[in-house]
């Protein structure tokens, strides 16, 4: 293993974080098109009794995007055959019986669970990642269960001690919680997909997301290797959100921890995984982070103090889900069939679908403002997510989820093709 860059551990030393990024960086976040300014929207919602009347932490955050869909949801809900909700990527299929049984069997546990997770859970994570995704050289100490991956992403910059002197880089089109987590920690945020956009500066943390939410874009091995090499040369922590890794359709996603990317060296790398999509466990809040041993140990040390523990019955359910590949394959096939139905139906309605090579979404456009497309679909009883939820680059796209029942997907197809 090559010697570490002198700054490789800077993000672990709270006192050493201040001043680590150069001056002149500016947060490129802007209120998304169609959502209005955060202050104005919060004021409107306050008058409706739907938001805090006073400032505070929430005043530093953008409007919760789903709150802006109320009108479109009401319009879609008025359809005589009912709404087809393709907006939120929430599972609708039954949890596999073996997982339910594992949860129930562990439900008599009265004590506090271990923040680090049971040894059995950590063993299952290591084995499943090797078996399913070819991730090798992980040890149990490199695994940390989390209370759903959204929780981890929202608090990761804070848990790492980042602050106002630090820069967090997120994809130009991105899961909104990357930005929210940076704001909660008080860091600066830059949207960038290319390393050349960063110039000579060294951010504290750089997010990757492949397959992407919302676009379904898959980053290839060469791209990932380039990012890892660049980050290691500057002491930058790379966090790869891999919640959709097992859902490749037209491309085969690869983990940042795969030997072809990192040569088996997990230094400076974290991979975030969820069982919400692959095992329909969104309601269980079951996820985990794996990678760099020292960083995982630091996260564990802080999370112990904060009581960030995955309940023991959920840990038992996670073991059952990770040890069984059959239910995961069955769920993948369900999504594949829904994708095969929706993809041509969107085309017949005048939408072009960009990327969408993997994951749970179709990234669709008719070359018009995304809110207009969302309204057109809502008139037909179909609710989707406007692309501006995910950044300015999504202003002419909508995100169409595959997470509806077969019956509701068939209804959407009928409305799009009539």
UniProtKB/Swiss-Prot annotation:
Organism: Mycobacterium tuberculosis (strain ATCC 25618 / H37Rv)
Claim: NAD is one of the keywords in the record: no
Required cofactor(s): pyridoxal 5'-phosphate
GO biological process: biosynthetic process
Protein name listed in UniProt: Probable aminotransferase Rv1178
Gene Ontology MF terms in the entry: pyridoxal phosphate binding; transaminase activity
Residue stretches in coiled coil: none
EC top class, as a word: transferase
UniProt cross-references to Pfam families, sorted A to Z: Aminotran_1_2
Residues in the signal sequence: none
């Amino acid at each position: 293993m090559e010697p570490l860059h002198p700054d490789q551990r800077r993000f672990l030393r709270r006192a050493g974080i201040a001043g680590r990024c150069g001056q002149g960086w500016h947060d490129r976040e802007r209120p998304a098109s169609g959502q209005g300014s955060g202050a104005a929207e919060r004021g409107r919602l306050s008058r409706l009794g739907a938001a805090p009347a006073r400032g505070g932490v929430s005043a530093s955050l953008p409007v919760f995007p789903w709150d802006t869909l109320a009108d479109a949801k009401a319009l879609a809900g008025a359809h005589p055959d009912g709404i087809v909700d393709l907006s939120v990527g929430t599972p609708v299929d039954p949890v596999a019986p073996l997982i339910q049984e594992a949860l129930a069997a562990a439900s008599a546990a009265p004590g506090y669970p271990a923040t680090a997770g049971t040894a059995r859970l950590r063993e299952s994570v290591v084995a499943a990642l090797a078996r399913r995704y070819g991730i090798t050289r992980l040890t149990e100490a490199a695994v940390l269960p989390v209370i759903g991956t959204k929780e981890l992403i929202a608090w990761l910059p804070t848990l790492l001690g980042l602050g106002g002197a630090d820069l967090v880089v997120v994809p130009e089109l991105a899961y909104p919680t990357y930005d929210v987590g940076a704001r909660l920690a008080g860091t600066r945020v830059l949207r960038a997909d290319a390393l050349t956009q960063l110039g000579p500066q060294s951010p504290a943390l750089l997010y990757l997301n492949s397959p992407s939410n919302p676009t379904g874009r898959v980053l290839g091995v060469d791209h990932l290797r380039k990012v890892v090499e660049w980050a290691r040369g500057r002491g930058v922590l790379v966090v790869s959100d891999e919640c959709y890794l097992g859902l490749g359709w037209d491309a085969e996603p690869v983990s940042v921890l795969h030997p072809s990317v990192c040569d088996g060296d997990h230094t400076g790398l974290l991979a975030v995984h969820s069982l919400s999509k692959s095992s329909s466990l969104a309601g269980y809040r079951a996820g985990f982070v794996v990678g760099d041993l020292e960083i995982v140990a630091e996260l564990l040390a802080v999370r112990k103090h904060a009581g960030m523990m995955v309940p023991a019955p959920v840990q038992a359910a996670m073991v059952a889900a990770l040890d069984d590949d059959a239910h995961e394959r069955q769920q993948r096939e369900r999504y594949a069939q829904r994708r095969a139905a929706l993809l041509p139906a969107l085309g017949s309605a005048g939408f072009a679908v960009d990327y969408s090579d993997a994951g749970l979404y179709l990234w669709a456009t008719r070359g018009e403002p995304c809110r207009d497309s969302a309204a057109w679909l809502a008139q037909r009883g179909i609710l989707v997510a406007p692309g501006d939820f995910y950044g300015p680059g999504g202003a002419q796209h909508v995100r169409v989820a595959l997470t509806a029942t077969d019956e509701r997907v068939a209804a959407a197809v009928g409305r799009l093709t009539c």
